[in-house]
UniProtKB/Swiss-Prot annotation:
One of its GO terms (cellular component) is cytoplasm. Belongs to the Cytosolic-abundant heat soluble protein (CAHS) family. This is Cytosolic-abundant heat soluble protein 2. Residues 12-22 have a biased composition (Basic and acidic residues). The keyword Cytoplasm applies. The gene is CAHS2.
């Protein structure tokens, strides 16, 4: 495409965009046409095109390419003000990016600290629960030992009671045996005494008869 054809197409597009059509209403409108001067399209340098691609993407780059293709005579360089503006934009971008990263880091630290505290609280709760369980185990074993001791104590008491009753029975048996032995001894003594008295009486009688016979 030649430069004249490109310029003509550009002028036609500009006229079509700025043309005000007449609407079908009850009012009268006047079409206004403005004569557009034939100004060569500017040429965007590679640096500006690259910055435009970073900021707005491929669309701006394509538009810049179309514009730059229309003229090869006009070159537009970034002014110091534009460079300062771009530098400020870059600095603002760096600050905002740093702020985003710092907020993200603080968020991570906050969540980590909250999780750590929660984990510590849970660990402390588990530790106390384990201590309680250990104390319950001790009390359980103590209860078993005390129960065993009480059981053995009751068994010993029962055996002692049984032994005492056995001793009481043996004592009664011994008493009964002693009483029976004493009664047998008394009978023998009485019997022996009775026999001796009878013999003595007989002798007496015999002597008396002898004495009587002598007197006669």
């Amino acid at each position: 495409m030649s430069r004249d054809q490109g310029s003509t197409e550009y002028d036609a597009n500009q006229r079509q965009e700025q043309h005000q059509e007449q609407h079908n209403t009850s009012y009268t409108h006047t079409d206004v046409r403005t004569n557009i001067p034939n100004i060569p399209a500017p040429f965007i340098s590679t640096g500006v095109s690259g910055l435009g691609q970073q900021l707005v993407g491929e669309g701006f780059t394509a538009s810049a390419a179309r514009i730059s293709g229309q003229s090869s005579e006009t070159h537009v360089q970034m002014t110091p003000e534009m460079e300062a503006e771009a530098r400020k934009d870059r600095e603002r971008y760096e600050r905002e990016l740093q702020a985003i990263n710092e907020r993200h880091q603080r968020d991570i630290e906050g969540k980590t600290e909250a999780y750590r505290k929660q984990a510590e609280q849970e660990a402390e709760r588990l530790r106390k629960e384990l201590e309680k369980q250990h104390q319950r185990d001790i009390e359980f074993r103590k209860s078993l030992v005390q129960g065993t001791i009480e059981n053995q104590k009751r068994q010993v008491e029962l055996e002692a009671q049984l032994a005492k009753r056995e001793l009481d029975r043996e004592a009664r048996l011994a008493t009964q045996a002693l009483d029976q032995s004493k009664m047998a001894t008394d009978v023998q003594v009485n019997f022996d005494s009775a026999v001796g008295h009878t013999v003595s009486g007989a002798t007496t009688v015999s002597q008396s008869e002898k004495v009587t016979q002598s007197k006669h």
